């Protein structure tokens, strides 16, 4: 009888481990201080100064749940639910969305991983699938300016709803990445049009990329395309600003020399509605992290490095962008530079500080901005 009970217990234990489920609570709290000085180089206008407590300067503050279950041999099902919040105020990162950073269900097999839901785009450093974080020592940037690739690359949202993502198995260091977003659905308001998922009233996103990792070398390539909305039921919305469909080609990589890790990335963009930061209908005003508005063609280059120093990491970066807007009949050149230091005070906590500079040359103006930040980041 004892042998039978022992055998049954062993069988149950084996079955339990073979088809085990696992759920993890995790998060990041990043809070710091930031000072920004910006001068638009416009006669009669004063420069702007801003000093504030800021959340997520080196990494977005968040908490999340993730879990997996082995449902059969070679078949795993999992999920990620991640919320972004402002650690300085306690508010949601995105109004109306509790899991704004990620909400996905995935299937993982020997043939690759297939994901469904709201996730970070391949052309981002966000979530489970973003590729851009490996192209810079600063990821996709600290604060608004320091090391921010989006300051010299075409802008896209970091995340999109209703997205299907596929990542292939590892073939001797090579992986294929593919993604399609059906866009979003939203009701009509006095200022916004109706958007219907996977129809011409919403922007849709396609991307195909590859990554190759072998020893100290990592290489990345990505082509992505935005099928811009072309229909509106809002009388005041002509969709003129949407223009032609946007595409970008991004190449880059990094190499770890032990004494320093070096990064290089370049991007060509065409028909981009926005480059730099936030939308600005008047055209280029980029030093304040604004985007140009129109069908923009151009390119950007970013180089950076991370050097181990005194138990931490010293980071340097420099970037350049040239962009032309046929719609606004403007050309712009942009230069960026940044430096930072990150020091781990424990396994899960680090302190950081950094400084960044950006300057434009556009329409006989040379606007510029300087940013200085310092903060504390804790992961759990």
Outline where the language-model segments fall:
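Outer-membrane beta-barrel "beta-signal"
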Residues: 368-380
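Outer membrane beta-barrel
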Residues: 21-35, 50-185, 202, 211-218
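Gram-negative outer-membrane beta-barrel proteins
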Residues: 33-41, 85-91, 122-124, 184-188, ...
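Repeated loop/turn-to-beta-strand initiation elements of outer-membrane beta-barrel proteins
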Residues: 75-77, 111-115, 173-176, 216-221, ...
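Outer-membrane beta-barrel architecture
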Residues: 9, 64-66, 104-108, 165-167, ...
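Detector for outer-membrane/organellar transmembrane beta-barrel domains
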Residues: 207-338
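Transmembrane beta-barrel strands of outer-membrane/channel proteins
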Residues: 29-35, 81-83, 118, 178-182, ...
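Gram-negative bacterial Sec-dependent N-terminal signal peptides
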Residues: 1-21
